[in-house]
Design a protein with these regions (language model features):
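Nucleotide-sugar donor-binding/catalytic module of glycosyltransferases
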Residues: 1-185
């Protein structure tokens, strides 16, 4: 059903190229396949159950245009959950900042004082593609490398709405939790 919906939404619009993989090989693998098709100056990822505010991309690009040394721009992050009582939203507890150098952004990302939802220059993704050593958690490594290699990291006012749900691979208890350790080990 999702494939059919995507085809109907993007039909006739040359800005979109749909890619369908034969099997699920994890988020990092899929994103690396998509990056090979990316032609723009900036890259952002949006997971299938998440959404962006109407102005999110425009807001991020305006920060890049105003600050030529900026290599990564963080969205405001709002987590949400659909409950029987309605939609519950909570802003991610991150201090807003004007600009950080890459090393400082990297340090703040280690304990997620800085979240990992951002737009980056395509050149960062080309230099540091997604670590596909694990099916989960390895995108954390890529985020940290992008921050570390950035001349400047800034925030924008665009909002990324992140769907929080207990059945998510990274939130439920399973042996997949050990992928976190494997992902950390691959950072060496």
């Amino acid at each position: 059903a999702s494939w059919r919906i995507l085809n109907s939404l993007t039909a006739g619009d040359p800005r979109f190229e749909l890619i369908r993989l034969a099997s699920n090989q994890g988020q990092a693998y899929a994103r690396n396949v998509a990056l090979k098709q990316a032609a723009g100056e900036f890259v952002a990822f949006l997971d299938s159950d998440d959404s962006l505010s109407d102005d999110a991309l425009e807001s991020a690009v305006s920060v890049f245009r105003a600050h030529g040394k900026t290599d990564a721009v963080l969205f405001r992050l709002v987590k949400f959950e659909d409950t029987p009582a309605g939609r519950v939203e909570a802003a991610y507890p991150m201090s807003v900042f004007e600009a950080l150098d890459g090393r400082e952004a990297f340090k703040k990302s280690l304990d997620w004082q800085l979240h990992g939802i951002y737009v980056a220059r395509r050149s960062l993704y080309e230099r540091f593609p997604f670590d596909d050593s694990c099916r989960t958690y390895s995108d954390d490594n890529t985020t940290r490398l992008h921050y570390y290699a950035s001349r400047e990291v800034r925030c924008c006012n665009g909002i990324y709405f992140y769907r929080q749900h207990g059945s998510s691979v990274t939130h439920r208890v399973s042996v997949r939790r050990f992928d976190y350790l494997r992902a950390c080990e691959s950072m060496k």
